[in-house]
């Protein structure tokens, strides 16, 4: 299952199809963005094998400068990848959606910036430390019940634990 109604929260067990789907979208992005995309990685909870996640694939695209992506807004739109201005601080944010069902979040970040580092470190740390992944999973599941109809509050509720895990990952 991939996709979730915009604004809602529902977590499902990890699914193998997420990795394959992410690889397919990464391939499309590489073709569309060419050398502007310095690296493209599957990130977020769907890239962490042992935890529940919203069935929305997160992909991080590294660029030299955030402005480098702006000429591609129309090209991406033609592929149903829509620009969402100001959605995430410090990055350019796109969504793939079908009506009100979101399937992918695409985060454009500076290659050597904090955003890129955090996406990769968080994913790698939780994949390498199952006990930390389970702790995060338990927290997420409680938050998902509490904020089932308010994705913004759900996301905000996770910031402290994400910060703690990133601090550990970067030690």
Residue ranges of predicted features:
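Active-site nucleotide-donor binding segment shared across nucleotidyl transfer reactions
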Residues: 28-70
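Helical scaffold of the NTase/Pol beta-like nucleotidyltransferase catalytic core
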Residues: 1-41, 163
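Short amphipathic alpha-helices in soluble, non-transmembrane regions
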Residues: 71-79
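Short aromatic/hydrophobic-glycine micro-motifs
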Residues: 78-82, 171
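Short, flexible turn/loop "capping" segments at secondary-structure junctions
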Residues: 2-5, 50-54, 98
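Conserved catalytic core of two-metal-ion nucleotidyltransferases
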Residues: 81-114
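Short amphipathic alpha-helical segments
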Residues: 7-9, 55-59, 102-104, 122
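Catalytic cores of NTP-dependent nucleotidyl/adenyl transfer enzymes across multiple folds
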Residues: 108, 114-171
């Amino acid at each position: 299952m991939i996709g979730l109604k915009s604004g809602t929260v529902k977590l499902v067990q990890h699914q193998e199809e997420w990795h394959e789907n992410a690889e397919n979208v990464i391939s499309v992005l590489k073709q569309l963005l060419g050398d502007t995309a310095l690296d493209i990685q599957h990130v977020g909870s769907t890239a962490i094998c042992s935890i529940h996640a919203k069935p929305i694939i997160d992909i991080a695209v590294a660029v030299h400068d955030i402005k480098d992506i702006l000429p591609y807004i129309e090209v991406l739109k033609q592929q149903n990848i829509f620009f969402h201005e100001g959605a995430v601080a410090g990055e350019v944010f796109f969504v793939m959606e079908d009506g009100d069902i979101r399937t992918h979040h695409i985060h454009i970040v500076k290659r050597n910036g904090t955003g890129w580092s955090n996406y990769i470190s968080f994913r790698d740390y939780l994949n390498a430390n199952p006990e930390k992944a389970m702790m995060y999973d338990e927290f997420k599941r409680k938050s998902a019940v509490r904020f089932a109809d308010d994705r913004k509050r759900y996301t905000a509720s996770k910031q402290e634990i994400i910060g703690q895990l990133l601090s550990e990952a970067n030690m």
